[in-house]
Regions:
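Nucleic-acid endonuclease domains
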Residues: 1-77, 81-162
Length: 162
């Protein structure tokens, strides 16, 4: 297929929710929402943990629970955020007042970093204490997020690095 000869509309359809690749990922249960990057990151994290005996097995939680994406067989709660660059910023952590009151919403935060091909580049694991240390308040959005920095990468647990 010569992509240069396709119109913008034809190209858009190839990456749309009605595309064959999207529908197949949906049929496999990988894409449960329209957040493709986030869903791929969750899949890669859970797959990696499941296939490495020294890591706990994780199961996806029902979409929609704020800051809760997976749980381990030990009952630990995981939040999973996915970015597409080692210089990215995670999505939002909502309910800032509970965060400011240090109400622990999860045991671990996994930051999944994908490369330009949406392949796994890195998985960082942060404890609640790490999250609390590195979180930044977004005044405009009234929420928290975390920026991926060298300091963050050097100070938290690296689960996977390509």
């Amino acid at each position: 297929m010569d992509y240069k000869k396709l119109t913008v509309y034809e190209l858009a359809k190839l990456i749309s929710p009605s595309s064959e690749a999207y529908l197949e990922l949906q049929n496999r249960g990988i894409l449960r929402t329209k957040n493709v990057v986030g869903e791929l990151g969750e899949y890669f994290a859970i797959d990696y943990y499941t296939n490495h005996p020294k890591l706990p097995n994780l199961s996806l939680e029902t979409p929609g629970e704020q800051n809760v994406d997976a749980s381990s067989t030990n009952g630990e709660i995981y939040s999973i955020k996915t970015v597409t660059s080692r210089r990215g910023t995670t999505g939002s952590f909502w309910n800032p007042s509970s965060i400011e009151n240090n109400e622990k919403k999860f045991n671990y935060l996994l930051i999944v970093i994908l490369n330009n091909e949406y392949s796994l580049d890195m998985i960082l694991q942060l404890t609640w204490e790490d999250f609390f240390k590195f979180k930044k308040f977004n005044k405009r959005m009234n929420n928290y997020n975390i920026s991926i920095t060298k300091k963050l990468i050097n100070e938290v647990q690296i689960i996977y690095d390509r």
